[in-house]
Regions:
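His/Asp/Glu-rich acidic catalytic environments and adjacent acidic regulatory segments
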Residues: 1-8
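Long, charge-dense, solvent-exposed interaction surfaces that engage phosphate-rich ligands
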Residues: 165-210
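Conserved alpha/beta core segments of nucleic-acid transaction machinery
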Residues: 145-159, 196-220
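Alpha-helical promoter-recognition and RNA polymerase-docking modules of transcription initiation factors
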Residues: 8-149, 153-167, 171, 180, ...
Length: 220
């Protein structure tokens, strides 16, 4: 029994000294989804998205339950596909961004893919998500390559966002969503999105990222 605190302490030290290795090991334990699970979870997320898009109103008890189910389903889909994010991120190492930054950018793309995935179209989620993940990473790399000098205050805020993202990744065992980052920083999600937008050029934000819909943008 006396060895348990030691094991916890050693685990904490490994997590602090090598967060990337710890994170990769953590997501590797998350089970993959079956095609049937993708459809079920995807439908639950879409129900949640439709309800949230209806605006600020009082939800019924059933709707509140559907929102909770949808949120859990979204988290499950994201955690089950983080290995895909890491796989894509490794292909873009050495192109201007650190691996952790690539994973963070790819996780934002994954989040958008989960929110927009329509199971009724018949394609695999990983195929759909890959495009969003890659798009998010390549845009971030393109922005970095322009070597735009950001204002000091903006640079500091972006550094804080990265720090909070890593801390949440340690806590959750997954890269956090924008909502989770905003809540941890005690700022509205609109403010977080505004900071992320400012770090990109207007051209990179105004380019459509979904040819089928024709009106989805990175900053959406």
């Amino acid at each position: 029994m006396t060895s348990s605190p030691t094991r916890v302490s050693e685990s904490s030290r490994r997590r602090s000294s090598d967060p990337i290795t710890w994170y990769l090991a953590t997501i590797g334990r998350e089970p993959l989804l079956t095609p049937a699970e993708e459809i079920e979870l995807g439908n639950q997320v879409q129900t949640m998205m439709r309800l949230t898009e209806e605006g600020d109103r009082e939800f019924s008890d059933l709707e509140k339950k559907l929102l909770r189910i949808g949120k859990r389903s979204k988290q499950r889909m994201m955690k089950a596909n983080l290995r895909l994010v890491v796989s894509v991120a490794k292909k873009y190492q050495g192109k201007g961004l650190e691996l952790l930054d690539l994973i963070q950018e790819g996780s934002l793309g994954l989040e958008r893919a989960v929110e927009k995935f329509d199971p009724t179209r018949g394609y695999k989620f990983s195929t759909y998500a890959f495009w969003w993940i890659r798009q998010s990473m390549t845009r971030a790399i393109a922005c970095q390559s322009r070597t735009i000098r950001l204002p000091v205050h903006l640079s500091e805020r972006l550094t804080a966002i990265r720090k909070v993202s890593l801390e949440l990744a340690h806590k959750l065992g997954a890269m956090p969503s924008r909502q989770e980052i905003a809540e941890a920083m005690a700022i509205p999600i609109e403010e977080l999105d505004g900071l992320l937008r400012q770090s990109l050029t207007t051209s990179s934000l105004d380019a459509p990222v979904n040819g089928d819909e024709g009106r989805s943008f990175l900053g959406d």
